[in-house]
C-alpha cells in the first residue's frame, strides 16, 4: 500500500517503482509467496490540500515553508563516522554483507531476502567499547534439506542439519567478510574468539518477508 499526499504536475509510475524496489530487495520467486511481478500494489496517494500547499510553495525559495509540523528526538554519537551507535552500525554492516553474498549467488546459495541482526557490545565504566559479546544473525533460507520421511524425528533432523550448515557459513563465510570490510583498528580490536553467535535462534526461518 502506497499512501500519502503530494502536489505535482509530474507523472510517476507508482506501480513500476514499487515493483522495481521489491525486485531489488530480492523478492523474485513465487515460492516466497510474495514476489515483484504478482503482488498487489494499491495506491492511496492523493493531492495535497491547497490550504496546506500555499504554505509550502513560495516564489522565493528562502521563504519555503512546511505544511505540517512534528516533534522528533534522538541523539548522535561519535562512536562511528556516521554518528550512529557502534552496535547498530555493525548490525547494519552484517546485513549489508549478507545481502551482497545473496546477490552474488556464489556461496550460501540458500539465502532468501529477509534477515535481521543484533550486536551486543560490552562497555567499560567510561563508556568506551571493550569487546563484542554477542552477535545475532537471523536469515531466511530455502528448505534445502528434505526429511527422509514424514516423521517428526526426520523433520527435526533435517532442520538441525540445515541450521548447522547456516551457522557454519555465518561464522566462516559471512563474518570474515564483515571483518575484512572494517578498516578502523579500534573496531577490529573488539572482535574476539569468545563472541557468542546466535544464528537463527528459533531453529528454522523458511517462511519470512511480507508473507511471514
Report residues per predicted region:
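Active-site-surrounding "flap" and adjacent substrate/cofactor-binding loops of secreted or lumenal enzymes
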Residues: 8-22
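Short N-terminal amphipathic alpha-helices
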Residues: 1, 12-15, 29-34
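Short glycine/threonine-rich loop-to-helix capping motif typified by GTGT followed
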Residues: 3-12, 202-212
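Intrinsic structural disorder
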Residues: 1, 16-20, 188-189, 212
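Short beta-strand scaffold segments in enzyme catalytic cores
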Residues: 1-2, 118
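Glycine-rich, mobile lid/loop segments that gate access to catalytic sites or pores
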Residues: 23-211
Amino acid at each position: 500500500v502506497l499512501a500519502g499526499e503530494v502536489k505535482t504536475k509530474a507523472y510517476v509510475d507508482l506501480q513500476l517503482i514499487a515493483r522495481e524496489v521489491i525486485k531489488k530487495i530480492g523478492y523474485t520467486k513465487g515460492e516466497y509467496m510474495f514476489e515483484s511481478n504478482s503482488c498487489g500494489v494499491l495506491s492511496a496517494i492523493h493531492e495535497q490540500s491547497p490550504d496546506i500547499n500555499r504554505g509550502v510553495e513560495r516564489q522565493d525559495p528562502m521563504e519555503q515553508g512546511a505544511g505540517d509540523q512534528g516533534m522528533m528526538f534522538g541523539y548522535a554519537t561519535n562512536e562511528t563516522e556516521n554518528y550512529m551507535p557502534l552496535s547498530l552500525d555493525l548490525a547494519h554492516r552484517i546485513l549489508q554483507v549478507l545481502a551482497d553474498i545473496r546477490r552474488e549467488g556464489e556461496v550460501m546459495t540458500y539465502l532468501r531476502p529477509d534477515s535481521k541482526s543484533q550486536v551486543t557490545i560490552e562497555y567499560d565504566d567510561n563508556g568506551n567499547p571493550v569487546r563484542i559479546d554477542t552477535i545475532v544473525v537471523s536469515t531466511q533460507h530455502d528448505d534445502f534439506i528434505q526429511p527422509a520421511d514424514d516423521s517428526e524425528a526426520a523433520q527435526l533432523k533435517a532442520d538441525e542439519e540445515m541450521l548447522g550448515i547456516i551457522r557454519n557459513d555465518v561464522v566462516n563465510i559471512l563474518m570474515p567478510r564483515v571483518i575484512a570490510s572494517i578498516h578502523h583498528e579500534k573496531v577490529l580490536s573488539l572482535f574476539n574468539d569468545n563472541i557468542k553467535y546466535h544464528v537463527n535462534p528459533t531453529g528454522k526461518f523458511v517462511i519470512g518477508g511480507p508473507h511471514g
